[in-house]
């Protein structure tokens, strides 16, 4: 009888070890446990136990378990991309930025969200850079409606207005990554251009989130920069993608954004310098008062 019970237990353990749905959850939990920004809390320990005790009978159930656990380990910015999501993302025709040259030497740059491939990222940045003259009186960077994506093409697009110092830090549980313009250009694969020193107005709304909030923070603390509009979405944290079986990907929040001012941002909205329902008009008024 005892041998039979031991044999049954061994068979159950073998089945658990070979079940792809259970292994899917276990792999994701290991990733979250090691890297999640909130994966050192008692809430995470409870969520981890629940996830590991689950017995998903399908890939969809396993993914739902992982998605729920991810919100505890990484917070609201964490999400799971299925294979279908990945395919849709790869085939999406991403909107490119626009540049409008206004009277008085003002450039109005609109940066939409972007999650395309590296080739499209180069096109994204160069769409702006190729449209800019070498001298400007001022620039308006419109981040309204930009929900984020890959921050490097976005920053590369406006790098001419940033100083040659540490523009942003990404602070994880183990590291503090310091980012400067040179690093951004190398990652984006875009040639660096000469700086343009002029007043910079940034426009935000409640949809300005994630990577577009990172762009906002790149300019934070600069005496020639000012923000106008509404508080942002509150996703100023750094996400890292991790591959999972079946072509899916866990996009896990692993750290916080740190501005040059030393301020730390993560889940809270970023308030504008000027709260207004007419940000473009307010920005133009400020520019007119500050043009050299």
Indicate where each model-derived feature is located.
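A short, well-ordered alpha-helical element
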Residues: 117-137
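Gly/Ser/Thr-rich loop/hinge elements
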Residues: 148-201, 237-243, 254-258, 264-265
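Sec-dependent N-terminal signal peptides
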Residues: 4-14
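Short acidic catalytic loops
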Residues: 109-110, 131-148, 202-203
